[in-house]
Amino acid sequence: MAQAKKKSTAKKKTTSKKRTNSRKKKNDNPIRYVIAILVVVLMVLGVFQLGIIGRLIDSFFNYLFGYSRYLTYILVLLATGFITYSKRIPKTRRTAGSIVLQIALLFVSQLVFHFNSGIKAEREPVLSYVYQSYQHSHFPNFGGGVLGFYLLELSVPLISLFGVCIITILLLCSSVILLTNHQHREVAKVVLENIKAWFGSFNEKMSERNQEKQLKREEKARLKEEQKARQNEQPQIKDVSDFTEVPQERDIPIYGHTENESKSQSQPSRKKRVFDAENSSNNIVNHHQADQQEQLTEQTHNSVESENTIEEAGEVTNVSYVVPPLTLLNQPAKQKATSKAEVQRKGQVLENTLKDFGVNAKVTQIKIGPAVTQYEIQPAQGVKVSKIVNLHNDIALALAAKDVRIEAPIPGRSAVGIEVPNEKISLVSLKEVLDEKFPSNNKLEVGLGRDISGDPITVPLNEMPHLLVAGSTGSGKSVCINGIITSILLNAKPHEVKLMLIDPKMVELNVYNGIPHLLIPVVTNPHKAAQALEKIVAEMERRYDLFQHSSTRNIKGYNELIRKQNQELDEKQPELPYIVVIVDELADLMMVAGKEVENAIQRITQMARAAGIHLIVATQRPSVDVITGIIKNNIPSRIAFAVSSQTDSRTIIGTGGAEKLLGKGDMLYVGNGDSSQTRIQGAFLSDQEVQDVVNYVVEQQQANYVKEMEPDAPVDKSEMKSEDALYDEAYLFVVEQQKASTSLLQRQFRIGYNRASRLMDDLERNQVIGPQKGSKPRQVLIDLNNDEV
């Protein structure tokens, strides 16, 4: 019997082992792992939007759950891992907590979306949305998705929006309790303790503030009492101060009046001498009145004349001179205007485009300009301006435009300006710009073009007071310079405004050679240009000496004093003319004599305004090594034409925007003291119009150049001598090779370093080679075909 029982128990054990092994085999089914891996891979593809499948999965979850889909990804991954490794479904408590947390996040994301935009989710089928979002690669903000949308739409009528917020908070708390496996009492206890601690700290802070306020009140009361006590004692002190100060106040004006009275008799003759001295010194330059110099006193000579003083021509007024008429300029041809219907259609397209991207805005005004049309957009309340700015590429795509420029906001208005290029740029002529403004009382009034509204823009140079013009090649920079010079010729006589033109490119400004407004012929040599700027600095200093001796502050006051004196005296004295210095290409000057040019520009821009000297600098290379920080900071008015990059735009005007210009005269103008840019379509001026104006001016009066203002002539190389016998050979070698260095001379002539460096110094001093510029090779300034060679 016992053996039979043992056998039966052994059989039972073997059968139970077989059952457990079969269960393990069933539980260890590899299909479960394959499914788990597949789910993980799909979730990863959806989270990072990898490939076609990833975008489809993410768009599907985005449609259903919105922003809360990321929690869905996490919950699916956690559930997959738990079921795969524990081989059982998670506990009901944690499952319920996860579901409650998902619902709470649906409410939260939908509420945030509702409060931010107030736009409802679209009710389109899931598959069509998934296909469209994949096709356009665009995932709009859906808040809580379709599930969150319907949850909010069903809950708001039942418990109101405030009730939904309370329910959402309760759901979040419940999910935390369910997931963390804490009792409600423990959670409530912790929350109450935190609230009590917060209230306790708040009460302590309030009590400290009350104590501080009480101390301040007591301090104020004490100070008031001290002030009252001082006021009671003040009458005696006041009497003493009055007694001591009144005689001083009386003495100072009485003493000054006596000095003025004693000098009043000699003052007219002294003033007359000062102005006569300047008049005679001015006439010395023209060699008209050299005999008046003998009447000057030694004191006047010592105060006015100096070793480096440059005497400016005091040109006698040419009564017969007549400024050129505007009829010399061509009449603008009639052009086809932009269709209003087309503009209104684009305005409607613009509104619809913004609406598609969740921006509620209306087009309130449209301004049609010569080159661009500005659509004035007024966004709805709560819409961020940055949201509109970030859509500039989408707006350009919707309007089929080359590029758009967004001015957000328009200065002084609660609106955003969207500038869209016209299909055809309208030509703006200089004549139509000057027609409404000329003749002007301001002799330095120049025409720039028309703004977005089509209004003509003219600016006075003396209010700028200096101008920087920069832009890439072919953007309209040279036409703008010609327009400025022509505007001056059309408005000012030679004795009123003088010009100094510097043109290292040798082809842009040579047409103006011979006009009577020029101080010196057009300067084309970069070395002479640097010297010419130094002459302008010396002229500026001379004028300030005149202002000092005549007790005037600027050129306007000095000329008024001269006019008054001319009415009283028989001898007429010339007034000081304004001087406009125009540099057409700054980059060439900075390469040859960068330090000298930069120093001269710095001094002119800092001090020359009161002296009536104004500087216009133009360059087609707006880089920081050309437009240095010193030059940029001292030239407040700037014009930026089309450039290739935003970096160049920031170099010119301090902000981006010039990289979006259209070229062909399209510019951004920043005036002195302006915080915003004005977009202007520049006035066009043909070469024939310039030539007609120049011929008209030259026929009336020939140029009368000021010799003392001309740069020094280049030193004759044949007369130059060097102590080294190898100098002539080194000179010829450097000119033939068109390169120079100390090591090159050492190898060629087999000499030491010291001798070679001395030869290099001699060559530089004789202006055969340029100065040393770091690691860059020296520039050879003499051409092989030069007659001197």
Swiss-Prot record:
Compartments, record wording: Cell membrane
Cited InterPro entries: AAA+_ATPase, FtsK/SpoIIIE/SftA, FtsK_alpha, FtsK_dom, Ftsk_gamma, P-loop_NTPase, WH-like_DNA-bd_sf, WH_DNA-bd_sf
Chief place of localization: membrane
GO biological process, one term: chromosome segregation
Record's GO cellular component terms: plasma membrane
Cross-referenced Pfam families: FtsK_alpha (PF17854), FtsK_gamma (PF09397), FtsK_SpoIIIE (PF01580)
PROSITE patterns: FTSK (PS50901)
Region (Disordered): 1-25, 209-275
A GO molecular function held by the record: ATP hydrolysis activity
Residue ranges of domain FtsK in the record: 454-650
Membrane topology designation: Multi-pass membrane protein
SMART domains: AAA (SM00382), Ftsk_gamma (SM00843)
SUPFAM superfamilies xref list: P-loop containing nucleoside triphosphate hydrolases, Winged helix' DNA-binding domain
Cytoplasmic compartment segments: 179-789
Family assignment from sequence similarity: Belongs to the FtsK/SpoIIIE/SftA family.
Complex and partners: Homohexamer. Forms a ring that surrounds DNA.
Function: Essential cell division protein that coordinates cell division and chromosome segregation. The N-terminus is involved in assembly of the cell-division machinery. The C-terminus functions as a DNA motor that moves dsDNA in an ATP-dependent manner towards the dif recombination site, which is located within the replication terminus region. Required for activation of the Xer recombinase, allowing activation of chromosome unlinking by recombination.
Protein name, as recorded: DNA translocase FtsK
The organism of origin for this protein: Staphylococcus aureus (strain MSSA476)
Phylogenetic classification of the source organism: Bacteria, Bacillati, Bacillota, Bacilli, Bacillales
Gene that encodes the chain: ftsK
